[in-house]
Amino acid sequence: MEFKNQVYGIIAEVCQDDVVKENPEIAIFDEGLLDSFGTVELLMAIESQLGITVPITEFDRDVWDTPNHIAEQLAEMK
């Protein structure tokens, strides 16, 4: 659970909204919390804070659509 909380914290920082911590199933793109520039910022933050490199080609909005799904994808990449 600690890893997920770390991921949620990074997403909240990039989105500038703690709602992602409170509701990890929120659709961050549909709700306007993250856009294409935010996506790049998120991937850079993930790499710098978690040491996980996510190629932009691996980032599919339909798969990486909620904080929970992002945490699950990153856990598989660790």
From Swiss-Prot:
Gene Ontology molecular function, alphabetical: D-alanyl carrier activity
Any one of the GO CC terms: cytoplasm
Entry-annotated residues carrying O-(pantetheine 4'-phosphoryl)serine: S36
Domain Carrier: 1-78
PTM: 4'-phosphopantetheine is transferred from CoA to a specific serine of apo-DCP.
Record localization: Cytoplasm
InterPro entries: ACP-like_sf, DltC, PP-bd_ACP
Protein's UniProt name: D-alanyl carrier protein
NCBIfam families from the UniProt entry: dltC, PRK05087.1
Keyword Cell wall biogenesis/degradation on entry: yes
Family membership noted in the UniProt record: Belongs to the DltC family.
Short name of any one Pfam family annotated for the protein: PP-binding
Task performed by this protein: Carrier protein involved in the D-alanylation of lipoteichoic acid (LTA). The loading of thioester-linked D-alanine onto DltC is catalyzed by D-alanine--D-alanyl carrier protein ligase DltA. The DltC-carried D-alanyl group is further transferred to cell membrane phosphatidylglycerol (PG) by forming an ester bond, probably catalyzed by DltD. D-alanylation of LTA plays an important role in modulating the properties of the cell wall in Gram-positive bacteria, influencing the net charge of the cell wall.
Main location class: cytoplasm
UniProt record, GO biological process: cell wall organization; lipoteichoic acid biosynthetic process
Protein's pathway: Cell wall biogenesis; lipoteichoic acid biosynthesis
Organism: Bacillus pumilus (strain SAFR-032)
Keyword terms, alphabetized: Cell wall biogenesis/degradation, Cytoplasm, Phosphopantetheine, Phosphoprotein
